[in-house]
Regions:
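Generic transmembrane alpha-helix signature in multi-pass membrane proteins
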Residues: 12, 89-94, 122-130, 145, ...
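Small-residue-rich segments of transmembrane alpha-helices in multi-pass membrane proteins
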Residues: 80-92, 138-154, 200-208
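Helix-coil boundary and interhelical linker segments in multi-pass alpha-helical membrane proteins
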Residues: 1-5, 31-49, 91-107, 159-167
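The feature identifies polytopic integral membrane transport proteins across all domains of life
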Residues: 105-109, 129-144
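Alpha-helical transmembrane segments of multi-pass membrane proteins
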Residues: 55-65, 111-122, 179-182
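Cytoplasmic-side transmembrane-helix entry/capping segments in multi-pass membrane proteins
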Residues: 73-85, 108
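C-terminal ends of transmembrane helices
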Residues: 60-73, 124-132
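Mid-bilayer segments of alpha-helical transmembrane spans in multi-pass integral membrane proteins
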Residues: 85-96, 103-125, 150
Length: 209
């Protein structure tokens, strides 16, 4: 039962990392530093002073940068590599009753995969918001960013209070992200088919020379 709860908590934290890479790491590191939670011994470095300073500064920079047009898209692109790593660290560090190697492998599969999927859904939401409101894309993205800040903060609190509920929220986030990815894939295939068909139907010029 303990392992199941730790797995669910790890997935929930990883899902939140799909929206914000650094805040979950900072919160988990701080809670571990103050003795509120335990980490897998191999991941105790998350609660070191230097790690907390890096996580704290990065959290502030991510919070501010995500509200600025162009910078937010750059951070999302960078997050494609950072957030899965953050998700892996969070999920692995929660598995205190398993060996470090096992915890790392499980963390990569559950945490890294979850964070990457949620991150992809977030990126697609931002793209759709910019495309739907080209003149107000920056405002729309800033509003979405603030809502994500609220969601992640609330999510982290719920995860510490009730891992079961946080895990269910993670499943919902994963379902929405997968739906967005599939919707974009279908629309992309449809657009490609339309463009290909249009080119095939283009009248060819006849050379009379």
């Amino acid at each position: 039962m303990i392992l199941l709860v730790q797995l669910m908590l790890g997935v929930a934290l990883a899902a939140s990392a799909g929206l914000r890479a650094w805040l979950p790491l900072f919160v988990v590191g701080l809670l571990a530093r103050t003795g509120q939670i335990d980490l897998n011994a191999s991941f105790d470095f998350l609660s070191r002073t230097d790690a907390l300073i890096v996580f704290g500064v990065a959290t502030v920079l991510e919070f501010l940068g995500d509200k600025i047009v162009v910078v937010d898209h750059f951070l999302d692109s960078l997050g494609t590599f950072i957030r899965p790593v953050a998700g892996t660290l969070l999920a692995s560090s929660m598995l205190t009753v398993t060996e470090p190697v096992t915890a790392t492998v499980v963390g990569i599969v559950t945490g890294g995969g979850t964070a990457l999927t949620v991150h992809a859904g977030k990126m697609l939401t931002r793209i759709k918001a910019t495309a739907a409101l080209p003149l107000h894309g920056g405002t729309a993205n800033a509003a979405l960013s603030l809502s994500e800040d609220f969601v992640v903060g609330t999510w982290l609190w719920i995860a510490m209070v009730s891992p079961w509920v946080a895990f269910l929220l993670a499943l919902v986030a994963l379902a929405v992200a997968v739906w967005l990815i599939m919707a974009l894939w279908r629309s992309g295939k449809h657009l490609l088919a339309v463009l290909t068909g249009a080119r095939k139907n283009e009248p060819r010029s006849i050379d009379l020379k």
